[in-house]
């Protein structure tokens, strides 16, 4: 019994880290033969997994060695350079704060970005409770054993899985023994040191792993230093049938990314110049996670975790302010251009926007896997449930100021009464799911899944109680309290079929549905009559609807030769009642959240990878067409086609910040067993800029004070 079960425990410890090669060994006439079977975990928790040919989607798998080979700064950096359908939007111009875009859906650290990807670390969802944002700086890259990028609206992965899910599994001392230290230096004062060490106790029952990372740079933009400090530690225990792991992730980061700049300022002062400063984010994290698994027998496995996660965020943003006059100091389109080292201070009015967010979350997840025949056919059934609770404290204030000669904002000690926010939020989320894969025969495999989600969101306004009626615009009176109780629920199904006529070809098709509930932040900033500043000067709002996504995917993968693999997939995802942040002001970041009807993402991913001796390569092409599928009117005063501060968006207009075409090529040569050299070549098409949702903006020429600046598009690059 023990000889049968012990390899399964070791496999469980490794399996969800990345798709691994599980060896089926058969002895015949004293000769051992092996067959490599690529196994992929299909749930957020570590589980028994499925062979790749049985999975009806174009899942992408990366192991820790591949991350190490490319010396990626963070996980977002690696994904952008290598994975099909992935691009980045570097709005903040900070290496640890990019938006990751996958098939037109986003995982971003920026509040206000419509989030559409779920991200998990060791089975725990790490999308932040306040806004579903993803802080990439809180995921230590040198602690990652592997990642799975699962496309589509797979309901098994729960809330926010509209366009895909990213599962990250961390290292342990059993699979990563020994130590390493790495130090690098670069331009703009960049310094990075990473260290790790892992091992196993003498009796083999306990393993341990610890890693740390320190990053510091001045930044390529003016006044843009960043310091990132990350710590990860894990201790594990196992016997013949069970395994436990307790891990801790900590971070203390201070990042400055001074954001976008107007084209005319860049032409005048250079690419390194900034608009205003600072744009500072301080993130701290304390994350405890206990994972366990137990085999009841050869066919039944229990996997579970429980966690506590505290994530704190402080921001300080220096902005121009068109709502404040201080003597002869005000704001207009030309004032920033006049602020330089040669000009006197006090030309532009400004504001220091401060926010503080404290997020405490805890919960658990559990699943049972049954690998037992059904009607004499191979079958794997997994049933599970999960609960997540979070408490949110959010505060925001604005201090009036003036922009100095370095484009920093000097505070005047005058606080805005209208911009003060003191919000308490509470969320409770329950989910139950089941997924079953039935092998109809050796070639056909049917997968059916479903999940029921129920989420409650409660906001409590500590400043404006219920019944705080104010005149929000001439003749319009509304209750401006943020307080409210909201609940959302839905059952989301999925079905898929894979066909493997030969060992070198798999064809598949699938349909799945997912949902995203509006977050505490979005529910508090949904009134076009009272637009908000992000992170949020929020106001009393009409309710938002949940977002429902529906995805079709068809594809194939296989081997051209023993050394060349290929894959191809076409997909179509429609979001119903999609949520978007609608900008209403060019200069102060004000806007509101709204359901904008249907949006659609459809496209194609093609991949090819191979090796010839010491030389290896891969190439990938992605096409994406992301469009609005509903006519709507958006409040927008910065678009040249605006009529009465609004624009008309028509069905078929392209979504902003999403490239139509992307090409990625990777080449690597193994000089010695321990030394390789390689290069990545990436090319992305141009995109429509935010604010040009109708794709019709045209920059006016001649008048430097004209409101309508910029082409409305951002150029592609290679």
Which stretches of residues belong to each language-model region?
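Membrane-embedded beta-barrel scaffold of Gram-negative outer-membrane proteins
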Residues: 291-295, 301-319, 500, 506-512, ...
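Transmembrane beta-barrel wall of Gram-negative outer-membrane proteins
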Residues: 178-180, 185-216, 221-258, 278-297, ...
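Structural signature of Gram-negative outer-membrane beta-barrels, strongest in the C-terminal barrel
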Residues: 359, 378-388, 423-574, 622, ...
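Conserved C-terminal beta-signal and adjacent last beta-strands/turns
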Residues: 12, 20, 26, 198, ...
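Face-selective signature of the C-terminal outer-membrane beta-barrel domain
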Residues: 243-245, 283-466, 567-570, 608-611, ...
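A beta-strand signature from Gram-negative outer-membrane beta-barrel systems
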Residues: 126-128, 137-180
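Periplasmic plug
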Residues: 61, 92, 98-151
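Gram-negative outer-membrane beta-barrel transporters
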Residues: 367-371, 442-443, 563-576, 592-693
């Amino acid at each position: 019994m023990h000889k049968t079960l012990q390899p399964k425990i070791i496999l469980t410890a490794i399996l969800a880290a990345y798709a691994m090669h599980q060896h089926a060994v058969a002895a015949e006439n004293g000769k051992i033969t092996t067959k490599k079977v690529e196994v992929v975990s299909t749930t957020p928790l570590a589980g028994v997994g499925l062979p790749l040919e049985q999975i009806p989607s174009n899942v992408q798998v990366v192991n820790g060695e591949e991350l190490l080979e490319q010396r990626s700064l963070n996980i977002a950096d690696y994904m952008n350079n290598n994975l099909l359908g992935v691009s980045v939007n570097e709005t903040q111009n900070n290496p640890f704060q990019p938006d990751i875009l996958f098939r037109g859906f986003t995982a971003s650290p920026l509040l206000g970005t419509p989030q559409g990807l779920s991200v998990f670390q060791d089975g725990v969802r790490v999308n932040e409770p306040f806004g579903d944002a993803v802080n990439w700086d809180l995921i230590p890259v040198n602690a990652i054993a592997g990642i799975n990028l699962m496309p589509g609206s797979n309901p098994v992965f729960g809330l926010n899985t509209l366009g895909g899910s990213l599962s990250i599994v961390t290292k342990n001392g059993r699979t990563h023994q020994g130590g390493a230290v790495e130090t690098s230096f670069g331009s703009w004062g960049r310094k990075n040191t990473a260290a790790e060490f892992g091992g196993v106790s003498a009796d083999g029952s306990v393993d341990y792993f610890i890693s740390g990372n320190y990053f510091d740079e001045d930044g390529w933009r003016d006044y843009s230093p960043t310091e990132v400090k990350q710590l990860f530690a894990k201790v594990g225990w196992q016997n013949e049938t069970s395994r436990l792991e307790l891990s801790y992730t900590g971070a203390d980061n201070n990042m400055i990314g001074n954001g976008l700049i107007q084209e005319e300022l860049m032409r005048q002062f250079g690419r390194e110049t900034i608009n205003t400063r600072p744009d500072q984010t301080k993130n701290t994290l304390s994350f405890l996670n206990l994972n366990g698994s137990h085999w009841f027998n050869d066919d039944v496995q229990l996997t579970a975790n429980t966690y506590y996660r505290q994530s704190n965020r402080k921001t300080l943003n220096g902005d121009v302010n068109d709502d404040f006059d201080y003597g002869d100091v005000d704001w207009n389109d030309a004032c920033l251009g006049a602020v330089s080292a040669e000009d006197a201070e006090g030309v532009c009015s400004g504001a220091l926007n401060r926010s503080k967010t404290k997020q405490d979350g805890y919960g658990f997840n559990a699943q049972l896997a049954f690998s037992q025949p059904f009607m004499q056919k191979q079958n794997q059934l997994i049933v599970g449930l999960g609960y997540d609770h979070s408490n949110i404290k959010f505060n925001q204030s604005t201090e009036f100021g003036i922009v100095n000669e370095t484009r920093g904002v000097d505070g005047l000690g005058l606080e805005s009464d209208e911009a003060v926010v003191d919000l308490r939020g509470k969320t409770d989320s329950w989910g139950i799911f089941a997924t079953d894969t039935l092998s109809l025969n050796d070639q056909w495999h049917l997968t059916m899944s479903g999940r029921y989600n129920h989420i409650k969101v409660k906001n409590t306004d500590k400043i404006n109680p219920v019944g705080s009626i104010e005149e929000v615009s001439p003749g319009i009176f509304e209750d401006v309290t943020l307080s409210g109780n909201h609940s959302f629920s839905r059952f989301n199904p999925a079905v898929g079929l894979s066909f493997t006529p030969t060992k070198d070809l798999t064809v598949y098709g699938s349909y799945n549905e997912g949902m995203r509930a509006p977050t505490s932040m979005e529910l508090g900033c949904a009134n076009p009559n009272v637009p908000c500043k992000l992170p949020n000067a929020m106001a009393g709002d009409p309710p938002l609807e949940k977002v429902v996504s529906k995805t079709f995917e068809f594809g194939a993968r296989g081997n051209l030769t023993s050394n060349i693999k290929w894959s191809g997939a076409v997909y179509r995802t429609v979001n119903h009642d999609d949520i978007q942040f609608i900008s209403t002001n060019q200069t102060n970041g004000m806007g509101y959240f709204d359901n904008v009807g249907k949006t659609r993402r459809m496209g194609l991913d093609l991949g090819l990878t191979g090796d010839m001796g010491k030389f290896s390569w891969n190439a990938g092409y992605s096409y994406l067409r992301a469009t609005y599928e509903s006519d709507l009117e958006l409040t927008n005063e910065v678009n040249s086609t605006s009529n009465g501060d609004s624009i008309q968006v028509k069905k078929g207009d392209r979504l902003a910040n999403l490239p139509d075409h992307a090409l990625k090529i990777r080449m690597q040569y193994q000089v010695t067993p321990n030394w390789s050299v390689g290069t990545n070549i990436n090319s992305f098409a141009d995109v429509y800029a935010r604010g040009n949702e109708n794709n019709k903006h045209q920059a006016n020429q001649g008048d430097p004070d004209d409101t309508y600046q910029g082409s409305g598009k951002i150029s592609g690059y290679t």
